[in-house]
């Protein structure tokens, strides 16, 4: 005769202790009286009403942990029924006078008369088919690729493993084989001797080094206290620069493992950190005090930072040209207002452009018109054979000269339309960038743009070869001067990964916990003991048998922080193959009465 219900159901949200406008109450509707009564009227969550006799049972977290409560429709009194303190009571259901619910991975039943929950011993015979180890095709999980200096081989990371793969012919090698660790962002050293990568095998992200011929890895960093974002080799292979979640720029000497923090910002992370071709400078972009991104160069020997752009415009993604003449970057300086059709205002879109900073005051702009000169013939001096090798070495490593004074006045724009530009690279003659329509190249001499590919491009350390990723395939070519030939993909057929789901799920759980530890907007984690919360939910990991189980546990863990928009990506969830079936249908027509008729 009456109905107890919730107006809103948000129990699937990974947000505990919620007391906002979506926190629900239990409502009772009387059809005869056409009345509605709020029987909880509490700022906490009151959900899952179950009507048994004169009592309405429901879940509530008014006492912090979600427990069963009961409301007596005669006395109008509410009392607490269960007193669990470690895990929430979840998803109750009633049948007759019995209520069943889940708590901490166990099923309980409770008689409404006794109000005493009893644990139900459940034994399930299962093959655990979704938890069995299996071999997967690693080419479907590629996250990064890096070419060897001459482009004969590449290192590819896929599903937390590092592969050493031949570009043409040879043997594919999984050089890590760690199903319980997440390896990523492997890069070949410019001298070709080593492969560096990031791994969380110790429980924290650390940098590792491995001989390109194989062998045991060497741990370069130790006792790291936060997430390593990205890293880059120096051109001489002697140093590595990397950034982390504490907004630090760290310089690592590879031979002695000496670590120097050269910069730390309270405003934000440094992005796109890279070396100059002579190893003496770094460049990066970072947010300034007005929240606009500025491009900087850093003198490694002098230990001093210099701004290249001013703070009136957003500037980012800097990279040195390989000849050492230019600093190439993108900046939002194109003001092309579009008048709104719905309001009395302008909007600004496609403000980005590609810019060159002329590092030396002696470097002429590539767009400066030149005057014709008369060529004068002269007899070339005889070359000194003893100095050939010395000259060759000097030519191969350009000296980067940066005149800081007046550098903001030596910035020129490539004649390109306003857009978004990414993945910059330049050899001093051509500038490459990814934008709408794919990878493009601008020839500074011809002052002409060419389309290279619809796939993004990465260049080898020697600046001779390029790798493209398209349609789950990798392609290696000479650095193109026009349209790239992507007709021959690299053979990835032997990228086989042995997936141990039990170890992989434990790693995912741990990385999810660290992601919140390192990235949460408050260091005090809303006053919660984040380590204790990890231990609380890690106790359930041995019982995880599917990815959905893992997602549920991670969701419960991050829900303890009591914050919105903290979601769990479902990841690789198995689903059964279903037989497609037809569905019943009906022909519908409108009747003269105003109703619809089923024909």
What are these regions (language model features)?
Residues 33-37, 75-79, 114-118, 169-173, ...:
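Beta-strand initiation motifs
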Residues 141-160, 415-436:
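Beta-strand-rich domains and repeat architectures in extracellular enzymes and scaffolds
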Residues 13-16, 91-96, 105-106, 269-272, ...:
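Short beta-alpha junctions and helix-cap segments that line functional grooves
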Residues 217-222, 237, 438-599:
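Flexible, low-complexity junctional segments that flank or bridge functional domains
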Residues 79-93, 306-317, 415-422, 450-459:
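Conserved blade-ending motifs and adjacent loop-strand segments that build the rim/top face
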Residues 1-3, 48-55, 91-97, 145-152, ...:
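Blade-terminus and WD-like Trp-Asp/Gly-His loop motifs, strongest in beta-propeller folds
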Residues 1-27, 31-47, 57-69, 75, ...:
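A flexible loop/linker signature enriched in serine peptidases of the S9 family
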Residues 126-142, 400-417:
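A short helix->beta-strand "capping" segment at the edge of beta-propeller domains
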């Amino acid at each position: 005769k009456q109905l107890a219900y919730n107006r809103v159901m948000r129990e699937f949200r990974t947000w505990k202790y919620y007391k906002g406008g979506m926190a629900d109450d239990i409502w009772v509707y009387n059809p005869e009286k056409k009345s509605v009564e709020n029987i909880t009227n509490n700022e906490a969550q009151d959900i899952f009403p179950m009507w048994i006799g004169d009592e309405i049972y429901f879940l509530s977290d008014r006492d912090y942990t979600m427990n069963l409560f009961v409301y007596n429709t005669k006395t109008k009194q509410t009392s607490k029924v269960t007193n669990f303190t470690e895990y929430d009571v979840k998803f109750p259901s009633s049948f007759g006078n019995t209520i069943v619910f889940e708590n901490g991975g166990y099923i309980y039943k409770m008689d409404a008369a006794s109000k005493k929950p009893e644990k139900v011993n459940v034994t399930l015979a299962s093959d655990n088919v979704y938890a069995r180890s299996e071999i997967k095709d690693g080419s479907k999980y590629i996250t990064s690729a890096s070419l060897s200096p001459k482009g004969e081989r590449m290192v590819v990371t896929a599903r937390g493993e590092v592969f050493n793969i031949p570009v043409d012919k040879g043997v594919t090698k999984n050089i890590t084989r760690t199903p319980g660790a997440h390896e990523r962002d492997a890069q070949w050293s410019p001298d070709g001797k080593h492969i560096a990568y990031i791994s969380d095998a110790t429980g924290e992200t650390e940098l590792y080094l491995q001989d390109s011929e194989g062998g045991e890895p060497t741990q370069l960093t130790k006792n790291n206290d936060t997430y390593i974002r990205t890293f880059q080799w120096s051109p001489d292979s002697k140093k590595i620069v990397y950034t982390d979640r504490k907004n630090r720029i760290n310089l690592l000497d590879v031979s002695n493992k000496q670590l120097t923090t050269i910069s730390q910002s309270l405003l934000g992370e440094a992005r796109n950190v890279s070396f100059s071709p002579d190893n003496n400078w770094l460049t990066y972009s970072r947010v300034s005090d007005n929240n606009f991104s500025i491009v900087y160069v850093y003198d490694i020997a002098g230990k001093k930072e210099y701004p290249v752009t001013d703070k009136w415009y957003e500037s980012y993604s800097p990279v040195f040209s390989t000849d050492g003449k230019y600093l190439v970057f993108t900046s939002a300086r194109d003001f092309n207002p579009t008048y709104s059709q719905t309001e009395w205002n302008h909007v600004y879109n496609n403000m980005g452009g590609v810019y060159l900073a002329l590092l030396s005051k002696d470097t002429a702009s590539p767009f400066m018109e030149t005057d014709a000169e008369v060529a004068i013939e002269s007899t070339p001096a005889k070359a000194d054979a003893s100095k050939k090798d010395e000259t060759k070495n000097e030519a191969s490593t350009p000296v980067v000269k940066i005149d800081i004074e007046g550098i903001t006045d030596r910035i020129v724009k490539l004649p390109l339309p306003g857009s978004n530009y990414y993945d910059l690279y330049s050899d001093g003659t051509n500038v490459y960038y990814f934008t709408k329509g794919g990878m493009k190249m601008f020839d500074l001499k011809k002052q002409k743009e060419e389309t290279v590919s619809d796939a993004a491009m990465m260049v080898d350390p020697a600046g001779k070869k390029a790798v493209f990723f398209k349609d789950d395939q990798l392609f290696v070519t000479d650095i193109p001067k026009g349209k790239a030939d992507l007709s021959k993909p690299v053979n990835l057929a032997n990228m086989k990964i042995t997936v141990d789901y039990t170890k992989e799920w434990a790693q995912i759980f741990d990385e999810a916990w660290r992601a919140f530890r390192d990235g949460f907007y408050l260091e005090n984690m809303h006053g919660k003991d984040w380590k204790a919360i990890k231990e609380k939910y890690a106790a359930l990991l041995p019982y995880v048998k599917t990815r959905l189980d893992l997602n549920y546990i991670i969701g419960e863990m991050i829900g303890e922080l009591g914050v919105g928009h903290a979601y769990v990506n479902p990841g690789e969830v198995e689903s059964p193959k279903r037989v497609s079936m037809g569905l019943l249908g009906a022909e519908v027509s409108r009747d003269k009465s105003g109703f619809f008729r089923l024909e």
